[in-house]
Amino acid sequence: YNLNTTSTRRANAIAFDVREKGRPMREGGSLTGKILRYENGSPIMQPGTLKATKAIGWFIDEYGIAQVSMNMTNINVTPLHKAFDEVCRAAAERGVRVTGTEIVGLIPKRVLIEAGEYFLRKQQRSTGIPEEDIIKIAIHSMGLEDLKPFNPREKVIEYLLEDEDKTAKLVDLTVSEFANETSRESPAPGGGTIAAYMGALGAALGTMVANLSAHKRGWDERWEEFSQWADRGQDIVRRALHLVDEDTEAFNRIMDCLLYTSPSPR
């Protein structure tokens, strides 16, 4: 977590406030007091506020700022957005501000989805919006582009795996390309694929209504009710879009099997 300070000492203090291990307890609660120890000589630790985290403060020469570097050992216990808010709180108590977040390595997609939904709920906004919009909220809320550009296609595990799959998909076509492909003299894509696509569009329209209702003046107290309907709508959209290609692929597999089992001409 990037800080608006160059003080490694301040960064360390914040890290010790939040990391699970915490800091050694000292006599009188003073920073310079003697470390309190158990009979076996090991220091008595005052636990930090975040479970399943390890953290330390350091100075980054490349950017000229101090940072709380955190290793999150179990995101089910302490998710990224919870750690971000807690570091912000601890920093503010010491007169420091968190300016952004740097993610080193790859992350599961759900980390950003959960973060985006968390910050949307804090704003009392509907979470039933497209996946890429939720991820944008997460990026902006936690300042993931504070020091350098953040490209989800390069940082999210699922997106990297998707990009490695070079199989052409119908859902990646434009509307006109999809219509043209359907009109060609080939049996697929056919009725099942078109029905799935129409179902996705119908669910998308219903989701639009739920999202508009969630933010309608006078219905502020009902935002969560409409958000739940929008979430259900987005789930239907995703499943229907999956079926767009699944129907065509299933038909093609059947045709391949029929071709394989057909008797060879004599």
Each model region followed by its residue ranges:
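Long, contiguous binding/interaction regions
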Residues: 1-172
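Short, hydrophobic/aliphatic alpha-helical segments
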Residues: 169-189
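Amphipathic, well-ordered alpha-helical segments in soluble domains
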Residues: 178, 201-208, 243-246, 250
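Conserved phosphate/anionic-ligand binding catalytic regions in large, soluble enzymes, centered on
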Residues: 184-207
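Transmembrane signal-anchor/signal-peptide helices with a preference for the extracytoplasmic
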Residues: 209-217
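A structural-propensity feature for long, helix-poor, extended segments
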Residues: 217-256
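Conserved small/polar residues in nucleotide/adenosyl-binding loops
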Residues: 260-265
